Amino acid sequence: MLRGNDTGSDLAELLWDNGAPAPLRPPPPPPFQPFTCSAAATTSPPAHDYLFIKNLMRGGGAANHHHHDDDDDDDDDVPWLHYHPVVDDDDDADADTAPLPPDYCAALLSGLSDHLPPPAAAASRVDPDPCSSSHGAVVPSTSAAAAKQARTSGGGGGGVMNFTFFSRPLQQRPSGGETASASASAAATSTVPVESTVVQAATNRLRSTPLFSDQRMAWLHPPKPSPRAAAPPPPPPLAPTTRHRLDTAAATATVAQRLPPSEARAPDAPPPAATATATTSSVCSGNGDRRQLNWRDSHNNQSAEWSASQDELDLDDELAGVHRRSAARSSKRSRTAEVHNLSERRRRDRINEKMRALQELIPNCNKIDKASMLEEAIEYLKTLQLQVQMMSMGTGMFVPPMMLPAAAAAMQHHHMQMQQMAGPMAAAAHFPHLGAAAAMGLAGFGMPAAAQFPCPMFPAAPPMSMFAPPPPPPPFPHAAATAVEQTPSPPGAADAGNAPAVKQA
């Protein structure tokens, strides 16, 4: 068995078993070489060493290598380039990697096919003296080891950042006037080379796992533009936009009056260009859509103005309702006052009419105020009551005291005493034909004369005069006879004297 002490010789150990070589263990992993996608940086390994080792591993020996034709060699060159990557169970972190596109290593295949030698040249690399030792050694070159490393790393599929989509920041689709600036920024970004990730080797087999800390840092930070790339032109200045966009012309005019002149904008100004600054795979942008923000602002302002107008309308309605209620209340009060005033006027008119009628009934009444007129009416009523009492006393009919007031009852009692004292002379006051002496006698006792009463006096013989006692005889008979002669006789007395005497039987 041959061992290579030099690490640069890349010797492989082979064990001969009945004329066929069998590998004892896999060769040690070669040092890592950075992966590049360009065809110029790819080293083309000698394909005859690779084919020879493959034939030895199949068990056909060196002699079997000459029996294959050129078509089989072309088919068996690098079949792993067209296979999908194999993802292990423990490589869940690498599950987001995608297979390589078919034309990804087209340049590598074309370079490899140019360096294919004839099959016979592969046998010259075998040691001519296999019997000098129990083991034969095949010395592949460094380029063959690099090809193996590329094959193993390509089969894993997780150690290389395959997509160039993640090597540049995410951009929004340009529209309208943004085509020129977007194309310039895309051209500047495409010149940035793809950064490869670090691949670490396992102990028992070659295994490629990306260091996600470095990969994420490469994704999160935007790539630095090359100094040779042309700087993108500055974005056009943003045209100022109005804060409110209303549908009607009147609302637009109102908003234009409220805004200062510096915030006024052109009628057909294009929308501002939104620059994309996202660097991750998620669709995120540093600057939001300003058109949507403006729409939200205008919508909020319209809602605020609409609510304010609604509040004003409600307040106006409330004020109008209060005015209507107050007007109705005031009109009701005025109508009630008018009715009250009319009734009071009618009542005063009736009172005045009655007072005028009372003034006409009271003689010699020259009072104007109501209190004086009422006093005159009271005195006149008292006089009338006294006259009625005197008339009742003269006719012999007495009114019950209960029907007269207290003053009239006291006066009646006083007159009764006077009548008892005067005797039949008290009745002569009601008869003027009795003579002035009787009237004077009545006046001496404090009785007013009959002429003072406005009521007429009717001469009539009282019913009680027949029961009166005869007058007393005069003190001198001669004078009494003369008085009798002078006294007129009643008209029936003469007829009675001339009447014939009635004969008695």
From Swiss-Prot:
The keyword Magnesium does not apply. It is found in: Nucleus. Residues 324-334 have a biased composition (Basic residues). The gene is APG. Residues 335-384 form the bHLH domain. Plants silencing APG show enhanced bending of the lamina joints and produce grains increased in size, caused by elongated cells in lemma. Pfam families: HLH (PF00010). It comes from Oryza sativa subsp. japonica. Transmembrane segments: none annotated. One of its GO terms (molecular function) is DNA-binding transcription factor activity. Atypical bHLH transcription factor that acts as a negative regulator of grain size. Binds the transcription factor ILI6 and forms a heterodimer of antagonistic bHLH transcription factors that regulates grain length and weight by controlling cell elongation in lemma and palea. May be involved in the control of lamina inclination through brassinosteroid signaling pathway. One of its GO terms (biological process) is regulation of seed growth. This is Transcription factor APG. Homodimer and heterodimer with ILI5 or ILI6.
